[in-house]
Structure formats: structure tokens, C-alpha cells
A protein has these predicted regions:
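Contiguous beta-strand/loop segments that form the cofactor/metal-binding neighborhood of enzyme cores
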Residues: 2-89, 126, 130-143
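Generic structural motif recognizing short loop/turn segments at the entrances and edges of beta-strands
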Residues: 15-17, 75-78, 101-103, 112-118, ...
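C-terminal helix-rich "cap/oligomerization" subdomain common to oxidoreductases
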Residues: 41, 121-123, 130-171
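Juxtamembrane/interface motifs at transmembrane-helix termini
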Residues: 66-68, 92-93, 167-171
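Proline-rich intrinsically disordered, low-complexity coils
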Residues: 77, 97-101, 123, 146
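Charged, glycine/proline-rich intrinsically disordered loops and linkers
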Residues: 85-119
Length: 171
């Protein structure tokens, strides 16, 4: 889950307001099933789910913010987003066909009719660990800056340890 936490921290430019976690140690002393809810000061909420014992290996991140709900499945990989467009810019994309996977649905609410836009992105599947190793080697050879530097890695680890601590306390 530490990699998923790192991804969330890189996507959300805000301080963490609160962490909630639940899970279980089923096979031994390590957490095998983990659910974490990270709430940021900006109002963004990220739900992370990870399981080492499920029939299908699970790594999903769900983020919620005003007018946008995103589900990222890191195993497939794919990203699905539901956007309530208040600016009508997505409506133009649908009309012009500039975003092929984008669909539009109208929903009647107490505030009137709202448009919800659904988009599904399926990025090229890559071996994340191999990419990370290659980036590390490249940084050594070129004295470059890694995608995840020590400070960012430490922050992700601190959050992961806090999640583990909360699971242990609650379990």
C-alpha cells in the first residue's frame, strides 16, 4: 500500500487532515487486508484498498472532491472518472468528439438538471517496479532527480506506518 499512498500524495497538493484505517492480519504478523481513508485539508478524500489474500490481487484508489469522483485500479490498470461539469467545457468535448471515451448523462436533482461526464482511461500497462529501478539507475548515471526522492518516499512510509498502527490498534 505504500506505493499507492505515494501516488495519492503526489496527486494531492494538500496537508493530511485525518487518517482512518481498518484491516486484518490473517496470515501472520503483517497486515494482509487494508482499507485506508485519507482526508486532506483541501477537502479531497482518498480511499485505498489493498489485499494480499483476495482471490484477485486488489490495489484500488478512490478519490472524492467537489464535482469529481475517480476510481483508479492499479492492477488492470484503468482510471474511471465521474465529473459534474459546472463550466460546460466537457460538454464541448462530447459534442466535438475530442475525447473518444467521454460520455454524458443528465440527472435530475433538487437543483435542476445536472450533467455527469464519465471517462475511462486505460494507460499502457507497465511493470512499475522495473520502471522504478530504471529511474533509479538513470538518476545514478546522470545525477538526476528521481521520480520519488527520499523525502517523498519517507513521507509515504510515515503515512503507511500510521495506517498499519491504526489497523493494529483497531484489530
Amino acid at each position: 500500500m505504500v506505493h499507492d499512498i505515494d501516488l495519492v500524495l503526489s496527486m494531492v497538493d494538500s496537508d493530511i487532515k485525518q487518517i482512518q484505517a481498518s484491516g486484518a492480519k490473517m496470515m501472520g504478523t503483517k497486515v494482509d487486508v487494508a482499507h485506508a481513508r485519507i482526508e486532506f485539508s483541501s477537502g479531497v478524500v482518498a480511499n485505498l484498498k489493498s489485499s494480499r489474500i483476495a482471490q484477485n490481487y486488489v490495489r484500488k484508489i478512490r478519490t472524492y472532491e467537489k464535482n469529481l469522483y475517480t476510481i483508479t485500479d492499479l492492477m488492470i490498470p484503468q482510471i474511471e472518472s465521474y465529473n459534474v461539469d459546472v463550466s460546460s467545457s466537457l460538454s464541448s468535448d462530447v459534442a466535438l468528439g475530442t475525447k473518444p471515451g467521454l460520455t454524458e448523462t443528465e440527472v435530475e436533482t433538487a437543483d435542476g438538471i445536472k450533467k455527469i461526464y464519465y471517462d475511462k482511461i486505460v494507460p499502457e500497462k507497465k511493470d512499475a517496479l522495473l520502471e522504478e529501478i530504471n529511474n533509479f539507475i538513470d538518476c545514478i548515471q546522470t545525477r538526476g532527480v528521481p521520480v520519488v526522492d527520499g523525502t517523498k518516499g519517507l513521507r509515504a512510509l510515515e503515512v503507511a506506518l500510521e495506517v498499519e498502527k491504526k489497523i493494529t490498534k483497531n484489530g
